[in-house]
């Protein structure tokens, strides 16, 4: 079946040429810049950064600048300086700025750039990142794209700045698939939607005629697996984002719950409801549609998530009386409980870095989003409230997105929070939204 609502093709339309540094700007200072952010410190003071409006013949330059600034500010690691404080007006982004003018306003880093339209209709976006106190250029790049992809250029530039100043990959050039919820609570329409990580460019990828739940990206970013109640019973589908084509992953006799891809994209792990009311974890090989049962209990085993190397699986099970977190080998061997605190644990998901597991915890009437080490130690709750659920990791493993429903609220909303628990932000969506899943970095 083809869903003809919208084309969600993910295109690689950029070419980058790094380090386009003019000979006159090459300096003899050490390659390691003075300005940097130690992202591994417990408490981080945001870095003051000046982001000048990119020069352009129209509003496109300032628009791109605004997206870059918003990305960096939302990370909690950067504090963009108000443009009203700028002393120097940049007229030539290729020339070295007057560093003293930027040091006066405590801009520890400076971004300049330019947008020009090419004869073939494409846009050329150039930017430079400067260390103002070190008096040197840190990075210079240019990108070519089509005019309708200007926001993506902004995200890519923000990622480049983030990586140069923190030493780690950014997460701004990514997408999020989620469940869009509209209509009254008694007749809620739940359809799949996809958007940029900042909430822009929302597009619907299912028509809402049947409830759709638990969307998850494939590692190649081109496919989404999800559960649909089309026909009255829950089934798992695989949707091709580029073409809108979808296929039934498996038509199992019982309910199919929480499908998720393996890191290599060749398998889907999911829970199947048994006749006795229990649920066990299975994998399906997408190449030949063969299934393998991994757990065999009288409990509810669900919400399986692979480790980044594919060697282990974390899941939730009430085999001990209430839902707790367990880790087992990818073949189902050696299951062991890792959660030890009071309350119930659910929706575990392994960090892309491999060092942490995020989860939902219910305790004393509160739903919390937390993280723990993969052996269960070091549990930390990042945010708590009436109802918080469904964490998903940014591809760099530094930020989580989840959904929250406040007491008395009409429906859930999406939020992000970093690992310090101090930087929580709402992501604006057209309607209520739940069950987000973050994509890997786009290419």
Swiss-Prot record:
- InterPro entries of this UniProt entry? 6-blade_b-propeller_TolB-like, PD40, Tol-Pal_TolB, TolB_N
- Please provide one cellular component term from the Gene Ontology annotations of this protein: periplasmic space
Q: Which residues form a coiled coil?
A: none
The alphabetized list of GO BP terms reads: cell division; protein import
What SUPFAM superfamilies does the record tag this protein with? TolB, N-terminal domain (SSF52964), Tricorn protease N-terminal domain (SSF69304)
Q: Where in the cell is it found?
A: Periplasm
Q: Does the keyword Cell division apply?
A: yes
What is the first-listed, main subcellular location in coarse terms?
A: periplasm
Pfam families cross-referenced by the UniProt entry: PD40, TolB_N
- From which residue to which does the signal peptide run? 1-33
Q: Which UniProt keywords apply?
A: Cell cycle, Cell division, Periplasm, Signal
Stated role:
Part of the Tol-Pal system, which plays a role in outer membrane invagination during cell division and is important for maintaining outer membrane integrity.
Instruction: Extract the NCBIfam families matched here.
Output: propeller_TolB (TIGR02800)
Q: Which family does it belong to?
A: Belongs to the TolB family.
Task: Fill in the subunit field for this protein.
Answer: The Tol-Pal system is composed of five core proteins: the inner membrane proteins TolA, TolQ and TolR, the periplasmic protein TolB and the outer membrane protein Pal. They form a network linking the inner and outer membranes and the peptidoglycan layer.
Protein name, as recorded:
Tol-Pal system protein TolB
Q: Which organism is it from?
A: Brucella anthropi (strain ATCC 49188 / DSM 6882 / CCUG 24695 / JCM 21032 / LMG 3331 / NBRC 15819 / NCTC 12168 / Alc 37)
């Amino acid at each position: 079946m083809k869903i003809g609502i919208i084309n969600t093709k993910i295109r690689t339309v950029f070419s980058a040429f790094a380090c386009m540094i003019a000979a006159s700007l090459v300096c003899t200072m050490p390659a390691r810049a003075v300005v940097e952010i130690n992202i591994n410190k417990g408490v981080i003071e945001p870095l003051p950064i000046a982001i000048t409006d990119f020069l352009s013949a129209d509003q496109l330059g300032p628009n791109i600048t605004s997206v870059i600034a918003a990305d960096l500010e939302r990370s909690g690691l950067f504090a963009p300086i108000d443009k009203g404080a700028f002393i120097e007006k940049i007229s030539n982004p290729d020339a070295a700025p007057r560093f003293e003018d930027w040091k006066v306003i405590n801009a520890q880093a400076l971004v300049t750039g330019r947008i020009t339209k090419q004869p073939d209709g494409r846009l050329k976006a150039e930017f430079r990142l400067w260390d103002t106190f070190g008096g040197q250029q840190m990075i210079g790049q240019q990108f070519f794209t089509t005019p309708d992809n200007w926001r993506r250029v902004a995200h890519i530039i923000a990622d480049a700045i983030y990586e140069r100043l923190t030493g780690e990959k950014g997460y701004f050039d990514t997408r999020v698939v989620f469940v869009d919820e509209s209509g009254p609570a008694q007749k809620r329409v739940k359809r799949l939607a996809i958007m940029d990580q900042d909430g822009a460019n929302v597009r619907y990828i299912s028509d809402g005629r049947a409830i759709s739940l638990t969307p998850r990206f494939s590692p190649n970013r081109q496919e989404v697996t999800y559960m649909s109640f089309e026909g009255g019973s829950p089934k798992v589908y695989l949707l091709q984002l580029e073409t809108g084509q979808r296929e039934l992953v498996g038509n199992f006799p019982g309910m199919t719950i929480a499908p998720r891809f393996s890191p290599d994209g060749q398998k889907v792990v999911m829970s199947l409801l048994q006749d006795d009311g229990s649920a066990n974890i299975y994998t399906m090989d997408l190449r030949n549609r063969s299934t393998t049962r991994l757990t065999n209990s009288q409990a509810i085993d669900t919400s399986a998530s692979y480790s980044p190397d594919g060697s282990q699986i974390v899941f939730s099970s009430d085999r001990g009386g209430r839902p707790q977190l367990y880790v087992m080998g990818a073949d189902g061997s050696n299951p062991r409980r890792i959660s030890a605190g009071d309350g119930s644990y659910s929706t575990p998901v392994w960090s892309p870095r491999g060092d942490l597991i995020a989860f939902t915890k219910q305790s004393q009437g509160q739903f919390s989003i937390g993280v723990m080490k993969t052996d269960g130690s070091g549990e930390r709750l990042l945010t708590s409230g009436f109802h918080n659920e469904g964490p998903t990791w940014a591809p760099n493993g530094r930020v989580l997105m989840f959904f929250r429903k406040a007491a008395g609220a009409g429906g859930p909303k999406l939020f992000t929070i970093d690992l310090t628990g101090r930087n929580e932000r709402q992501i604006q969506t057209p309607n209520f939204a739940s069950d987000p899943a973050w994509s890997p970095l786009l290419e």
